[in-house]
Amino acid sequence: SDRGPPGRWRCLRLCVPLCALAFGPVAPSAALLVLAPTGSGEVPWTTALELGAGPALATSLVLFCSHFHQVEEDAAHGKRSPVVRLGTARAAALIPWFVGLSFTLEWLPVALGHWPPTALLSGLGLPAGWALIRLMRRYHDQPQRTCISKFLALRFQAWNGLGLALGLALAPLWPLG
């Protein structure tokens, strides 16, 4: 039903942006505040955005891919998901951008010297990201085949996030840079 709050957010087309905001700067800033010394009280927005932008985009990709297999049903019921509005071909063409930008946002801090080289372990998500890109390029308009896209996106998000977290956690134990 679209009567509850999630339905209202959907009507306003705010699901993907709210997802990106929640998993982007908001969740990491909360974690950083908890880890900060007592009494600091300052929200580390820049660090939170740097830590959360790539994983937030990967998480938003899961939500985005959850619409491909139900385009006809959504359109028939007046639901205007991004995939319905763009069409499956144009929406599928965005997936390499989601994946590539996720990695760019995670690897740029390494290139700039803000993060240790071990953060490149986020590349563990690359096989799932590549499988998702290949699937959607080939079968974007075949709902029976695209129904697994959300699971591939979830696999990308999980391996990418696990690799990034492990890379950042292992850095003090394995100094490479």
Predicted regions and their residues:
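Helix-coil boundary and interhelical linker segments in multi-pass alpha-helical membrane proteins
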Residues: A27-A53, T104-T118, A165-G177
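Transmembrane helix-loop-helix
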Residues: S1-P6, P44-T47, W97-Q144, G177
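Solvent-exposed interhelical
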Residues: A56-G100
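Interfacial loop-to-transmembrane junctions
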Residues: L12, L132-L162
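Transmembrane alpha-helical segments that form the membrane-embedded catalytic/substrate-channel core
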Residues: S1-G7, P25-A30, A53-F68, G125-R137
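Intramembrane alpha-helical segments
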Residues: S1-S40
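Hydrophobic alpha-helical transmembrane segments
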Residues: P17-L18, A48-A53, A92-P96, A119-L121, ...
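Small-residue-rich segments of transmembrane alpha-helices in multi-pass membrane proteins
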Residues: P17-L32, V84-T88, F151-L164
